[in-house]
């Protein structure tokens, strides 16, 4: 959804046995991003990481957030990325101890010119 000074959105899905990109967020023209990742599953844990790219079509990456685990039962993590030169970030998810349903919510604030 487009906001006056930025955007917001949500994405949900189910993890698998291999890492998949659940959501890609582009940073131009945004300066600040808040991401909530929630494990919406009552029986399985969820693992995630946030991978940053310097270039939109780049192949070199760095783990902005190394692999973390969210316990079953609506465990939620908050990630704040501010004033970064990243082109984009991928939020990647994988099974913890079984397929887990997840929800990702985010907001991005525009650069003020």
Go through each PLM region and give its residues:
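Tryptophan-centered short beta-strand motifs
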Residues: 3, 16-23, 53-67
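Solvent-exposed serine/threonine-rich low-complexity stretches and specific carbohydrate-binding patches
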Residues: 7-13, 62-73
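Exposed aromatic-hydrophobic patches
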Residues: 21-25, 74-82
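Noncatalytic modules at the cell exterior or secretory-pathway interfaces
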Residues: 31-35, 81-103
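Generic amphipathic, hydrophobic interface segment in small proteins and small subunits
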Residues: 32-46
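A generic structural motif
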Residues: 38, 53-55, 94
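Short, surface-exposed beta-strand/strand-loop-strand elements in extracellular ectodomains
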Residues: 43-59, 105
């Amino acid at each position: 959804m487009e906001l006056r000074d930025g955007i917001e959105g949500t994405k949900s899905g189910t993890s698998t046995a291999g890492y998949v990109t659940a959501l890609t967020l582009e940073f131009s023209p945004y300066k600040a991003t808040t991401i909530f990742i929630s494990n919406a599953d009552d029986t399985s844990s969820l693992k995630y990481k946030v991978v940053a790219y310097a270039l939109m079509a780049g192949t070199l990456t760095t783990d902005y957030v190394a692999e973390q685990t969210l316990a079953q039962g609506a465990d939620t993590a908050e990630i704040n990325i501010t004033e970064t030169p990243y082109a984009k970030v991928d939020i990647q998810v994988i099974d913890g101890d079984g397929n887990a349903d997840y929800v990702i919510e985010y907001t991005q604030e525009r650069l003020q010119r």
